[in-house]
Amino acid sequence: MATGPFTLLGRRHELTFGAMMSDQKADDRETGFVFTPTSIGDFYRWTGAYPEPDWASTPYALTKTHVKQSGAYGAVRWNLATPLKLIVGARLSNYEVDQGTFHFKQTAKFLPYAGVVYDIDDTYSAYASYTTIFNPQTYRDRNGNVLAPTSGKNAEIGLKGAFLDGRLNASVALFDAWLDNVAQTDTGHYLPDGSLAYYAASDTRSKGIELDIQGEWLPGWNVYAGASQFTASNGDGSRLNSQIPRATVRLFTTYRLPGAWHRLTVGGGVNWQSRFSQSALGPNGPVQVGQGAYAIASLMARYDVTSNASVAINVNNLFDKRYYTMTGFYNQALYGEPRNVMVTLSYRM
């Protein structure tokens, strides 16, 4: 990558350009649920012991995958006027995946993007951006083939503010994305190794809002807060990516005590998220399993022993909330961490 300034029409602008290339090969040996299950008896009395399968006689599937990527990119940051900046750029991408029975190749994929920033005054600035999207992925369909890259476009507008001489910053953004080949769980279908199969959803749309504020709003008192809300749907209007919570809120604050206690900083926060769900295969067919909305609180304290050394204690999941971080994957649910305490000693050279 190279970056440098240049002058045109009496104004100073900036040019950036570069290139990348990667070549990846992988051999995957996959074994499904081919051995005979052994009864464990009463589940509540099970000790976890289970006889080891006869791996030598277990058949497997060998998949060879070869992925090649290359591309070049460039962008110009135009200084159109004192309060107005325009960024125009593009990326040219080549992508190829060869998996024996499956082959996909995309040559010279042109991906333009543009953005504009306008400084309304010394406090506020507004911006807008447009980006084309092309993201290779490794998800596989029920036949074991890698899904084609996700492609589409994203538009965003926002407003940023810098307050208290730049010590406190806030922003709000609205986004709208249209994507094709978005990986979705193919309920009831699995790969030979037992992992979930996926299908590519097309004509999808995702839109939402993000708010963020962080910085020192009073001497020694810092705040970090944010919230987001989005919707996502298929072309037919059905819910998309239900395993991702639609709304999240996070708040954390720290305060450095004044006077003789100035070496001590205390803080706390809370993270909240809305419900999420995912398909799982039950005895009577596919079902939706999920986790309701929940909040996790935390506390911290840090003491600066010297200008270079400090000791900190963090208490996570303060109220020992029991919750799931994932549901449905391999027809199972994973608990989040219970209440835990971590002590850290840090030293800066």
State the predicted function of each range.
Residues 19-27, 92-96, 130-136, 163, ...:
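Transmembrane beta-strands of outer-membrane beta-barrel pores
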Residues 126, 150-216, 228:
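Membrane-embedded beta-barrel scaffold of Gram-negative outer-membrane proteins
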Residues 81-83, 176, 199-281, 319, ...:
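Gram-negative outer-membrane beta-barrel transporters
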Residues 15, 242-349:
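Conserved C-terminal beta-signal and adjacent last beta-strands/turns
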Residues 10, 83-86, 122-126, 165-170, ...:
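Repeated loop/turn-to-beta-strand initiation elements of outer-membrane beta-barrel proteins
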Residues 1-5, 67-100, 109-135, 213-227:
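Surface-exposed extracellular loop regions of Gram-negative outer-membrane beta-barrel proteins
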Residues 1-100:
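Face-selective signature of the C-terminal outer-membrane beta-barrel domain
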Residues 2-4, 72-78, 114-118, 157-161, ...:
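Residues on the lipid-exposed face of transmembrane beta-strands in outer-membrane beta-barrel proteins
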